[in-house]
C-alpha cells in the first residue's frame, strides 16, 4: 500500500482470512477511512510505529501518518485515545511475537473487554505485567509466551544457520551469531525491549544503545552515500561480512534485470579507482581485470566467469 500523509480517521474495519496447511488462519485487515479510501494494515504498521515512536522522541522526524502512526488511529477508533504511548508500544510489541499480530491485537482488546480488564491498559506496569505472563495457544497444541517463543525461535535460528554455514564457512559470522543469540537469551529475553527503550530519556537511551553496540556490535553500517563502516567488537573480522555482502550482490545481479553491480556505490566511495565501465554494463567481466574489486574477486575465486 502507498503511504498516506494525512491523518484520516478510520470509519470501519473489514477482515478476511484463509487457512494454511497447518490449520492456522491467516487474517487480512482493511481499514476503511472517512474519505472512503481503503488501507491494508499489517505487521509493517506495528514495526514502523515502534521505530517512529522511538525516533521522534530523540530526533526530528517527518513521517506519513500511515503506516507510522496507524496504531494511534486504531486506538482512537476503538475508543482508547487515553492510552499512553508507552503502553501502546508495549502492546504492539507483544502482538508482534505472534504470527498474526493484527489478529492478536484485536483478540486481546476483546479479551480485556469481556473480562472487564480494560484497566490493564491504564499503566505501563499493569500492561507489561499482564502481557509478559499471558499465554496463547499455538496451532501445534501447546501454550506459548513471549519467553518460550523467543527461546524456540533462537534455537530454530541457530539450527538453520548451522545448516546454511556448515563446516568452516564464515567462522567469524557463525561466532558473531552465537554471540548475538547468547546476548538475546541473557539480556533481551522475557522483556519488552523496545518499549523499555522508548521509556528511556536522553542520555539513558544513548547509553543503552551504546552498550548494545559495545556488547554485540553491528557488522556493517552503510549510509545513503554508499559509505560503509563496521561496529563489531575488536576480536571479530569484518572481511567475512563484506564477503557475504558480495555474495548477496551476486544473487541480486543474477536474479534481476539490472546490469549494475549492487556494490558500485560502495566501491565509488571506498575505492573509486577500482571502478570502471564494466561495473554498470557487465560486472561479471571484472574477474578478468588486473585490479580486482570485491565482486570481481568473488567471480574469479569461484570460476564463474
Q: Predicted segment positions?
A:
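Non-catalytic terminal regions of proteins
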Residues: 6, 66-305
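Metalloprotease/metallohydrolase-associated module, dominated by Zn2+-dependent proteases
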Residues: 1-63
Amino acid at each position: 500500500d502507498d503511504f498516506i500523509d494525512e491523518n484520516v480517521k478510520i470509519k470501519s474495519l473489514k477482515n478476511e482470512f484463509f487457512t494454511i496447511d497447518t490449520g492456522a488462519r491467516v487474517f487480512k485487515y482493511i481499514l476503511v477511512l472517512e474519505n472512503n479510501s481503503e488501507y491494508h494494515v499489517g505487521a509493517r504498521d506495528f514495526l514502523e510505529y515502534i521505530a517512529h515512536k522511538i525516533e521522534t522522541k530523540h530526533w526530528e522526524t517527518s513521517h506519513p501518518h500511515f503506516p507510522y502512526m496507524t496504531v494511534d488511529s486504531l486506538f482512537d477508533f476503538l475508543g482508547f485515545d487515553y492510552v499512553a504511548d508507552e503502553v501502546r508500544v508495549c502492546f504492539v510489541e507483544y502482538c508482534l511475537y505472534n504470527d498474526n499480530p493484527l489478529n492478536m491485537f484485536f483478540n486481546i482488546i476483546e479479551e480485556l473487554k469481556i473480562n472487564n480488564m480494560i484497566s490493564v491498559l491504564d499503566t505501563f506496569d499493569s500492561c507489561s505485567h499482564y502481557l509478559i505472563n499471558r499465554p496463547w495457544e499455538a496451532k501445534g497444541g501447546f501454550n506459548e509466551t513471549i519467553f518460550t517463543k523467543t527461546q524456540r525461535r533462537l534455537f530454530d535460528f541457530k539450527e538453520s544457520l548451522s545448516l546454511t554455514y556448515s563446516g568452516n564457512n564464515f567462522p567469524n559470522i557463525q561466532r558473531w551469531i552465537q554471540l548475538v543469540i547468547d546476548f538475546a537469551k541473557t539480556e533481551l529475553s522475557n522483556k519488552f525491549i523496545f518499549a523499555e527503550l522508548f521509556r528511556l530519556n536522553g542520555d539513558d537511551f544513548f547509553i543503552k544503545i551504546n552498550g548494545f553496540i559495545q556488547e554485540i556490535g553491528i557488522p556493517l553500517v552503510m549510509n545513503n552515500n554508499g559509505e560503509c563502516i563496521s561496529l563489531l567488537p575488536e576480536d571479530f573480522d569484518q572481511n567475512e561480512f563484506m564477503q557475504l555482502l558480495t555474495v548477496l550482490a551476486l544473487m541480486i545481479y543474477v536474479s534481476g534485470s539490472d546490469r549494475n553491480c549492487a556494490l558500485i556505490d560502495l566501491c565509488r566511495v571506498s575505492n573509486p579507482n577500482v571502478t570502471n565501465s564494466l561495473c554498470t554494463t557487465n560486472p561479471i567481466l571484472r574477474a578478468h581485470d588486473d585490479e580486482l574489486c570485491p565482486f570481481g574477486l568473488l567471480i574469479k575465486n569461484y570460476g564463474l566467469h
